[in-house]
């Protein structure tokens, strides 16, 4: 299955990136939600600026769509420096990373998305760069090969990952600041939807923004995506005016239910309930039953279902909770 086919998939879609950039917050004062992260970053950034230092290297982790890239942009804006962006899979060779590092200005931010996917060769080059602001490069081949050191300007590496556990210990230990992004509260998502609606010039009331927020799975990227589809519906059917009834109609038509579930969420939960009698069921069996890759279940589908209390991950496998049974109007089996 292709994750991008899902309207509520938290992953980024290329066609949305330009539109999302236009409505992203640029500074911490505009940043909504994640209060602990925001307050800590305010202190760390202000302290670095007072000292005239580069900000310590920053690792941001959490489920997709929660604003890791947005936070990296905010850090660069607050520090008043350039942001250079790349990703783990793109940096195939040590020379790819070396080219980026040697082009940095003092205190610049280098943002590496999916940093857990760095190759070991590239990661080895990163260690002295992060720790000593030095680049070790091998010149020549065979017996004539020699290592030279290149001094780098002080810089900030921001790494983003959905799989912090996949990082090697040496890499993880070199980050001075580690921030975990959590799923957003509905009230914060409502503020995000309202802010995006204003930027898009939409006529939308508070009840409508709340309706979109409640179905956005705690994820700003999904909230903005649903908002754009609600806008389309309103423009065609309701002269562009978005109230709670219009938003609800649009989202129902898009097959996004009151919990923010789409057909894949319902398919997973119903597979556990119907095919495995509520579980426990192993991940491989569950992946085969719904025709998905186990990584997609672990990284994309499960986190929200577990966080919302519809699915349990146990040593024996996945289990549907009473809340999941009730969601589908099915009576859960009585415990012996």
Curated annotation (Swiss-Prot):
UniProt entry tagged with the keyword DNA-binding: yes
Positions of Mg(2+) binding: 69
Entry GO terms, CC: cytoplasm; Holliday junction resolvase complex
SUPFAM superfamilies, A to Z: P-loop containing nucleoside triphosphate hydrolases, Winged helix' DNA-binding domain
GO biological process entries: DNA recombination; DNA repair
Residue ranges of the region described as Head domain (RuvB-H): 258-336
Ranges where the record places region Small ATPAse domain (RuvB-S): 185-255
Transmembrane regions: none
Entry keyword Cytoplasm: yes
Reactions listed under catalytic activity: ATP + H2O = ADP + phosphate + H(+)
PANTHER family according to UniProt: HOLLIDAY JUNCTION BRANCH MIGRATION COMPLEX SUBUNIT RUVB, PTHR42848
NCBIfam families assigned: PRK00080.1, ruvB
Family according to the record: Belongs to the RuvB family.
Quaternary organization: Homohexamer. Forms an RuvA(8)-RuvB(12)-Holliday junction (HJ) complex. HJ DNA is sandwiched between 2 RuvA tetramers; dsDNA enters through RuvA and exits via RuvB. An RuvB hexamer assembles on each DNA strand where it exits the tetramer. Each RuvB hexamer is contacted by two RuvA subunits (via domain III) on 2 adjacent RuvB subunits; this complex drives branch migration. In the full resolvosome a probable DNA-RuvA(4)-RuvB(12)-RuvC(2) complex forms which resolves the HJ.
Protein name: Holliday junction branch migration complex subunit RuvB
Organism: Cronobacter sakazakii (strain ATCC BAA-894) (Enterobacter sakazakii)
């Amino acid at each position: 299955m292709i994750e991008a086919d899902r309207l509520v998939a938290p992953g980024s879609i290329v066609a949305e990136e330009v539109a999302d950039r236009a409505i992203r917050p640029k500074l911490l004062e505009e940043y909504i939600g994640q209060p602990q992260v925001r307050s800590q970053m305010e202190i760390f950034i202000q302290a670095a600026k007072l000292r005239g230092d580069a900000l310590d290297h920053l690792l941001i982790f959490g489920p997709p769509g929660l604003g890791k890239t947005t936070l990296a942009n905010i850090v660069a804006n607050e520090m008043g420096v350039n942001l250079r962006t790349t990703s783990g899979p793109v940096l195939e060779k040590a020379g790819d990373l070396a080219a980026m590092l040697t082009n940095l200005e003092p205190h610049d931010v280098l943002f590496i998305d999916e940093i857990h996917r760095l190759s070991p060769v590239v990661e080895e080059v990163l260690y002295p760069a992060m720790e000593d602001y030095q680049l070790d490069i091998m010149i020549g081949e065979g017996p004539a090969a020699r290592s030279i050191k290149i001094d780098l300007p002080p810089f900030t590496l921001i790494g983003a990952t959905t799989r912090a556990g996949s990082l090697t210990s040496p890499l993880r230990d070199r980050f001075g600041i580690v921030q975990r992004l959590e799923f957003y509260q509905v009230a914060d998502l409502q503020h995000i939807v309202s802010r995006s609606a204003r930027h898009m010039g939409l006529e939308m009331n508070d009840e409508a923004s709340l309706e979109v927020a409640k179905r956005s799975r705690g994820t700003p990227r999904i909230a903005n995506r649903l908002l754009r589809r609600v806008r389309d519906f309103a423009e065609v059917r309701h002269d562009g005016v978005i109230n709670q009834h219009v938003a609800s109609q649009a989202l129902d038509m898009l097959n996004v239910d009151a919990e923010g579930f789409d057909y894949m969420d319902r398919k997973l939960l119903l597979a556990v309930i119907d095919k495995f009698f509520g579980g426990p069921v192993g991940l491989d069996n569950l992946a085969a039953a719904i025709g998905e890759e186990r990584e997609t279940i672990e990284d994309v589908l499960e986190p929200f279902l577990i966080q919302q209390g519809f699915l349990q991950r146990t040593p024996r496998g996945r289990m549907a909770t009473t809340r999941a049974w009730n969601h589908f109007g099915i009576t859960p089996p009585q415990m012996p």
